Amino acid sequence: MKKIYLKKLTAFGFTGILSFYLAGSVGAFECKVKQSSMAKPSGFPSRALTMIVPYGPAGGSGQIAAAMAEAVTGHTGVSINRDHKPGGSGTVGMTAYMSAPADGYTVLEHIDDASSAHALDSSRPNPSVDLIPLVISQVTFSQIYIRTNETRYNDWKSYAKWVKAQNGKSTIANVSKEGSMERVTMKFITEAAGLKIQQISFDKGAPRYGALLGGQVDALFEQPGDVRKFLDAGKFKPILTIFNERPSVFASVPTHRDMGMSFEPLLRFRGFYVHANAPANRVEWLQWAFQRAYCQNSYQKFNESKFMTVIDSYRDTAGARILINNSIAQYRDVYKAMGLDVK
């Protein structure tokens, strides 16, 4: 794979997309969906919805799917059955979803992997065209974690020094998909810091976190909300934040820029979708149901507990499409610079 020259990244417009990620206030929360109720169109839905989740139940997607399903049910009375279909960094779940009836009874949770997959291969579903985004409800940054009781290193500088001494034998738990946000970011980090690290692949969150906890890997790449329980329990600690400034909740943790890395960070976003061919009146009801669910106390408490109020996490359908389309363009530029076969 061709070496990425980090100085090129500013030309890709990551500063512009980061500004969009940060758009909106992250101060006092104000619900942007004022309509507290909506009549069911021709009785839809008359039964429970199904939510396909293309990742395991323990990771970030599993957690947000559970929280959003609870919020939607709480204010509409409509039950949602979650169907986890992990594998292929989201491709298994996406394939299953696109094969389901486009009647509005099946919705999809997905992350930025859907955008990056389409950026690499345009035959893959485009989340802003083949799907209708109901709501983007999480936008967040990533960190690198170590065990709190680790004795070989205790911060980024000592970790980087130790990694260099291992001659390429050090390991980090990450997702499996080449070209994903996580993999691309790790490539940026290793090139900028001059490190050689073996990335050990896990598509499900639980084994990924267990690998660090049990000592099978030396570090973990993840988002803070996904490992909140390990942080609160004192099991994991962050040593590097991949963001342009230090979030107040991690004020003592250096950013990649603090450590001399100049690339613009790629951020994780998660949301909910319905098939583009679903009946329009059903789509309208689902948009209201999911966007209003974002405002529910249970969901707001969930997002706050996952550090999801540091960045404005809310996008309605129009805002989600802008975010997705910008992301596709940015990833496509990065992949070309990486020498990947962009189709």
Task: Describe each region flagged by the PLM.
Residues V129-S137, K196-I200, D218, R228-L266:
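Short beta-strand->loop
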Residues S19-G27:
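C-terminal segment of classical bacterial N-terminal signal peptides
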Residues G60-I64, M68, G93, D112, ...:
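Stable alpha-helical elements in mature extracytoplasmic
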Residues F29, V33-K34, S46-A48, E191-L195, ...:
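An extracytoplasmic/periplasmic, membrane-proximal ligand-sensing/linker region
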Residues F29-D130, K169, E178, G194-F221, ...:
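N-terminal (or domain-start) structured segment
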Residues K2-G16:
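Bacterial N-terminal signal peptides that target proteins for export
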Residues A39, V72-G74, A96-T106, H118-P207, ...:
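Hinge/capping helix and adjacent helix->loop/strand transition within the periplasmic-binding protein
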Residues G56-A58, D112-D113, R147-Y153, V175-S180, ...:
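Short coil/turn segments
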